Amino acid sequence: MISGHNCLQVGQIAPDFSATAVYDQEFKTIKLSDFKNKYVILFFYPLDFTFVCPTEITAFSDKYSDFSELNTEILGVSVDSEYSHLAWLQTDRESGGLGDLEYPLVSDLKKEISIAYNVLNSGGVALRGLFIIDPKGIIQYSTVNNLEFGRSVEETLRVLQAIQYVQAHPDEVCPANWKPGDRTMNPDPIKSKNYFAAA
């Protein structure tokens, strides 16, 4: 990765950006800060018209309503131009395209966003980085995959639900594999024994 002085970490403010995106077959200028007071799933993918990428992008779109119900917007980003994004969106899924999406695809042609989020590799494309940003603009979760394998939309949704739960219940924490409805834990040496005793 091209990192320079970038040491972006969970718990830090997500770098704002302004860029051209494609949404509803139109070019629009968007800023990350446009989505303040919402959670944001910001995910990077290597290139348009590739192979693993459309499976991820369409999977997020197909689950969009689940994220929207949780006050969450999704933004996909690659180093392609907005014209490439539009052409891919105008290609149907049966031909390896995207068809219509429920969220914007952002053009990072100058690679500034990928650099800011420390996901640009030495080949000049973004690794499969994913960031969950809370309504205060703080990065609560980040993960980066190599190019050859995709991410789990279901796991992203689960983590988002866990983040929202602990933010609403600051005296509780979510154990491994937690899902809504599961038991949580009190982060206290004595009170936590109640969780472990019932596990």
Curated annotation (Swiss-Prot):
Record PTM text: The Cys-53-SH group is the primary site of oxidation by H(2)O(2), and the oxidized Cys-53 (probably Cys-SOH) rapidly reacts with Cys-174-SH of the other subunit to form an intermolecular disulfide. This disulfide is subsequently reduced by thioredoxin.
Q: Could you tell me what this protein does?
A: Thiol-specific peroxidase that catalyzes the reduction of hydrogen peroxide and organic hydroperoxides to water and alcohols, respectively. Plays a role in cell protection against oxidative stress by detoxifying peroxides.
A single GO BP term for this record reads: cell redox homeostasis
GO molecular-function term, one example from the UniProt record: thioredoxin peroxidase activity
Of which family is this protein a member? Belongs to the peroxiredoxin family. AhpC/Prx1 subfamily.
Compartments, as annotated in UniProt: Plastid, Chloroplast
Q: Where mainly located?
A: plastid
Q: Which GO terms describe its cellular component?
A: chloroplast
State how it assembles.
Homodimer; disulfide-linked, upon oxidation.
EC number, as in UniProt: 1.11.1.24
Instruction: Classify the source by domain of life.
Output: Eukaryota
Q: Which stretches are transmembrane?
A: none
- Catalyzes what? a hydroperoxide + [thioredoxin]-dithiol = an alcohol + [thioredoxin]-disulfide + H2O
What name does the UniProt record give this protein? Putative peroxiredoxin ycf42
Which residues are the active-site ones?
A: 53 (cysteine sulfenic acid (-soh) intermediate)
| Keywords assigned | Antioxidant, Chloroplast, Disulfide bond, Oxidoreductase, Peroxidase, Plastid, Redox-active center
Thioredoxin domain: residues covered = 8-165
